[in-house]
């Protein structure tokens, strides 16, 4: 469920508040296809395909979200939205907990199971881009346990039979970045497939998943 986070800055001579918007701002070049915050449903939507394990609907503080199970230790998630080759953008937000030195890994994907996956890997302090389970690019990233992490991934065709894969990641206390956090070009045409969101519970605790969105992009 979309929320707004309020950061209050105080000092002896000043008291003020700064509102950090958590939702993705409207883009005139993007057409919404899927927008699911689970506020109007009591179960996983029928149009979603569950990947491994038992994904359930949970709620805290009047906010409903998907709970990716803590056991078994495997990759759990959902597929949703249309199956397309390019011209698609996906976004979601995740929240996980650290247990000792163990942290969950999670991310969003496009182009189906063997397509592109954007993964937050706290153990390596990296944001990773994978294609067909192979890491093709990465960037430094510091994950914050217990906070919602927002992720966005898009694939678009470029002139000359190339494809741009672009991603943004930010946490609940930050504004959405103006520039892409990670970019990569691919000369091999992607296959058509559905968007996805998933997580691996290395810390032995459930992973929260919310605000799943898909757009067609020009």
Name what the model sees in each region.
Residues 38, 210-214:
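Extracellular beta-strand elements of beta-rich domains used
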Residues 61-62, 67-131:
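Secretory/extracellular carbohydrate-interaction modules
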Residues 130-152:
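Short, aromatic/His-centered strand-loop micro-motif at the edge of beta-sheets
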Residues 76-82, 137-143, 198-199:
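Beta-strand-rich interaction surfaces with strong enrichment in secreted/lumenal proteins
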Residues 24-50:
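Extracellular carbohydrate-recognition regions
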Residues 176-208:
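Flexible glycan-contacting loops in extracellular carbohydrate-active proteins
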Residues 41-65:
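Extracellular glycan-recognition surfaces and repeat-rich motifs
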Residues 38, 92, 147-158, 165-169:
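Short tryptophan-centered beta-strand motifs in secreted/extracellular beta-sheet-rich domains
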């Amino acid at each position: 469920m979309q929320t707004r986070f309020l950061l209050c800055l105080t000092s002896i001579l000043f008291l003020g508040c700064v509102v950090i918007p958590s939702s993705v701002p409207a883009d005139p070049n993007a057409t919404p296809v899927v927008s699911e915050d689970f506020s109007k449903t009591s179960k996983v939507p029928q149009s979603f395909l569950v990947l491994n394990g038992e994904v359930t609907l949970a709620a805290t503080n009047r906010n409903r979200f998907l709970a990716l199970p803590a056991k078994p230790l495997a990759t759990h998630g959902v597929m949703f939205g249309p199956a397309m080759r390019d011209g698609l953008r996906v976004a979601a937000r995740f929240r996980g907990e650290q247990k000792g030195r163990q942290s969950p890994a999670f991310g969003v994907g496009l182009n189906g199971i063997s397509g592109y996956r954007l993964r937050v890997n706290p153990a390596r302090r990296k944001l990773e881009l994978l294609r067909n389970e192979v890491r093709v690019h990465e960037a430094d990233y510091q994950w914050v346990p217990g906070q919602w992490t927002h992720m966005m991934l898009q694939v678009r065709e470029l002139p000359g039979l190339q494809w741009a894969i672009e991603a943004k990641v930010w946490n609940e206390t930050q504004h959405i970045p103006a520039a892409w956090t990670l970019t990569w070009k691919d000369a091999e045409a992607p296959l058509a497939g559905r968007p996805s969101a998933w997580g691996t519970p290395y810390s032995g605790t459930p992973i929260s998943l919310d605000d799943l969105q898909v757009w067609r992009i020009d």
